[in-house]
């Protein structure tokens, strides 16, 4: 029994390493309207990420988060399918379907930032500036890596657009643990 406990504890430690606990601070801050998308929407679910073998259904959470953030800020909807096509045409993806962040920043109107530190400070600063941070989480707190878009805070919780869910979720659904923070926002030209 002790052996099983030790193995379980070791696995849990390895799954959670590298993440930071982040909690919402300050008053409620809600968007006028949160644009939500699902990565598995049949209109784009089978679209490939660039020239890779990966599809929006399997690996499109990040693109869906970016599409949501840009749609909220630009006051013009851009779907994950449309954004994926734009990213593919502009060589934003590497051969494995990973986003090359510098390539996004070279596209007219798009700005991208990769934070070296993962803390609530970066998330709060993004929200206060009217931007929507993208955070890497683990599904159900312990599962595979996944990206969600933080769209605001309410009652001491961060509200998230999860591209695998129909409704807004909270960061506590992922253990309040973030493994990376990214930001893509739209600047009018």
Task: List each language-model region with its residue ranges.
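Active-site-adjacent structural segments surrounding the nucleophilic cysteine of cysteine proteases
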Residues: 1-90
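Conserved active-site-adjacent core of cysteine acyl-enzyme catalytic domains
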Residues: 33, 70-189
